[in-house]
C-alpha cells in the first residue's frame, strides 16, 4: 500500500507533456504514454531500478500508475505505454536543479531516436535520485509538471507541447 501511495504521488508530480495541441488528457478510453527514464553522469539509477522495475511501477496490475487510473476512473481510462531508457544526460544532477526546465527537453531530445512520439498521447519523464520536494536540496530536481513547454522532435516535425 505504501508503494502505491508513493507511486501515485511520484508519478503525478512527474513531468507530463501532451503531444501536439491537446488541451487536456482524456478521461475515458486508452491513453498511450512514453515513459522516459533519465539519469545523470553523477547519479545513476539504483541497479534494481531497471526497465522491468519501472514497467511494473507504471503499467503493472497492482500498486501502479495503471492501477491508480483504473480505480479513480472506475475502469473507464486505460493507461498503456512503453518504458524507454535509462538515458544518461550530459552533466550532473545539480546542473538540472533549481527548477531548470532543460531536464525535460534534454530527456526528450536524447530519447528521440528511439521513440516515435506520434504513437503517444503523453510523455512522462522520470529522473534518478531524490527530488528537491523530498530532499530539501536545491541542487536536486523538483519533480514537477511543467505548465508551458514546447519541444520539436525528429518525427516529421512533430511537436510535444503543453
Model regions: which residues?
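Bacterial N-terminal signal peptides
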Residues: 7-17
Amino acid at each position: 500500500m505504501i508503494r502505491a501511495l508513493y507511486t501515485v504521488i511520484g508519478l503525478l508530480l512527474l513531468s507530463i507533456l501532451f503531444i501536439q495541441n491537446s488541451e487536456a488528457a482524456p478521461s475515458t478510453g486508452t491513453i498511450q504514454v512514453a515513459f522516459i527514464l533519465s539519469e545523470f553522469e553523477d547519479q545513476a539509477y539504483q541497479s534494481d531500478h531497471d526497465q522491468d522495475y519501472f514497467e511494473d511501477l507504471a503499467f503493472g496490475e497492482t500498486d501502479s500508475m495503471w492501477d491508480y487510473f483504473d480505480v479513480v476512473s472506475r475502469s473507464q481510462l486505460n493507461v498503456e505505454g512503453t518504458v524507454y531508457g535509462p538515458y544518461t544526460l550530459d552533466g550532473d544532477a545539480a546542473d538540472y536543479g533549481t527548477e531548470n526546465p532543460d531536464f525535460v527537453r534534454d530527456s526528450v531530445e536524447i530519447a528521440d531516436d528511439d521513440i516515435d512520439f506520434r504513437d503517444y498521447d503523453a510523455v512522462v519523464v522520470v529522473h534518478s535520485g531524490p527530488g528537491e520536494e523530498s530532499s530539501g536540496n536545491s541542487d536536486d530536481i523538483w519533480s514537477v509538471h511543467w505548465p508551458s513547454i514546447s519541444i520539436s522532435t525528429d518525427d516529421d516535425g512533430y511537436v510535444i507541447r503543453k
